[in-house]
């Protein structure tokens, strides 16, 4: 009974607009567990929240829970099956974590607390992120309650690419570990969706390989179980995100990757072709096509429609050797 009271005291349940506005006025950092009515708040995270609240202090860190269907402000999170945690400081949304990942949650909490502390100490200007910057250039939800048309909200200017954690890596329980490595490498996951891809989707996805003997095997593998679909961007450095992601993946053949790029994802998690754990779009054109196929509501920024600097010059010089050109997987 005592533990139950601690849980209630730890997380304030927000079920009205008034309570939501009261939360926005709180000092320090507030982490809101957005949940669906049919599953309730994410209880496995309570012990982490209790630990961090004790370590950080009651004044600087607060926790709340809110059912997505009860508040208009949470409309875009309605019907999402994975837990979503929203981070608010000074009444503004500053971070979003999707999924029950205690390591990532703890890291994000500490980062946001440190950022919040530095502003008054260094005399800097507080910059609140927008929903579009945190969740990506997405037309989400696909319709508005007032019946109006959604505009292109790709205002962040970030270029994006597609990543897929394939069924073989998911089946071996490596998905969350791979996601952590992706984030540690400086990539931002704008959207993550776990689902089993359909045969029709994969036939369209790999249509450029339809005449190859490996086509049916590849399609069957990609439809054999759940995959994690990722929309990725990169905020650090000047390298195009498509190129950066391909480099991070390593060569398509895991055996080649282990020899030439042992730190790459395919070297660490791939076994043999076609079980190379992760997919990356080959170039900007492929990224746009693949994103449009698997995320039909995705809205491209102007930068996504442009080739990265130097791409035209590279094409004029001649064909570029790409060990993945034949496989494109």
Curated annotation (Swiss-Prot):
CDD domains: NDPk_TX, TRX_NDPK
GO biological process, one term: GTP biosynthetic process
Tissue expression from the record: Expressed in lung airway epithelium (at protein level).
Coiled coil: none
Superkingdom of the source species: Eukaryota
GO cellular component, one term: dynein axonemal particle
Protein function: May be a regulator of microtubule physiology.
Name the record gives this protein: Thioredoxin domain-containing protein 6
Species in which this protein is naturally found: Mus musculus (Mouse)
Primary gene name: Nme9
């Amino acid at each position: 009974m005592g533990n139950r009271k601690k849980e209630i005291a730890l997380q304030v349940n927000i079920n009205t607009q008034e309570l939501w506005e009261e939360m926005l006025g709180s000092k320090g950092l507030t982490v809101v567990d957005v949940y669906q009515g049919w599953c309730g708040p994410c209880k496995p995270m309570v012990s982490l929240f209790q630990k961090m609240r004790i370590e950080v202090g009651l004044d600087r860190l607060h926790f709340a829970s809110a059912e997505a269907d009860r508040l208009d402000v949470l409309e875009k999170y309605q019907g999402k099956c994975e837990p979503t945690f929203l981070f608010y400081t000074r009444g503004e949304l500053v971070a979003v974590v999707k999924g029950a990942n205690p390591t990532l949650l703890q890291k994000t909490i500490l980062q946001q607390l440190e950022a919040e502390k530095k502003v008054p100490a260094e005399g800097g200007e507080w910059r609140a992120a927008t929903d579009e910057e945190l969740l990506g250039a997405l037309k989400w939800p696909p319709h508005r309650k007032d019946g109006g048309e959604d505009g292109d909200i790709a205002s962040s200017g970030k270029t994006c690419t597609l990543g897929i954690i394939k069924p073989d890596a998911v089946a071996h329980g490596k998905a969350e570990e791979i996601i952590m490595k992706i984030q540690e490498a400086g990539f931002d996951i704008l959207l993550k969706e776990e689902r089993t891809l359909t045969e029709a989707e994969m036939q369209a996805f790999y249509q450029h390989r339809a005449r190859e003997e490996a086509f049916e095997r590849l399609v069957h593998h990609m439809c054999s179980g759940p995959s994690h679909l990722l929309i990725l961007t990169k905020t650090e450095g000047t390298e195009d995100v498509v190129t950066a992601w391909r480099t991070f993946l390593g060569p398509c053949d895991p055996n080649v990757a282990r020899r030439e790029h042992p730190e790459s994802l395919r070297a660490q998690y791939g076994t043999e072709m076609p079980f190379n754990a992760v997919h990356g779009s080959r170039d900007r054109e492929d990224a746009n096509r693949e994103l449009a196929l698997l995320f039909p509501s995705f809205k491209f920024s102007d930068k996504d429609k442009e080739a990265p600097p130097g791409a035209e010059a590279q094409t004029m010089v001649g064909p570029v050797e790409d060990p993945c050109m034949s496989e494109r997987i």
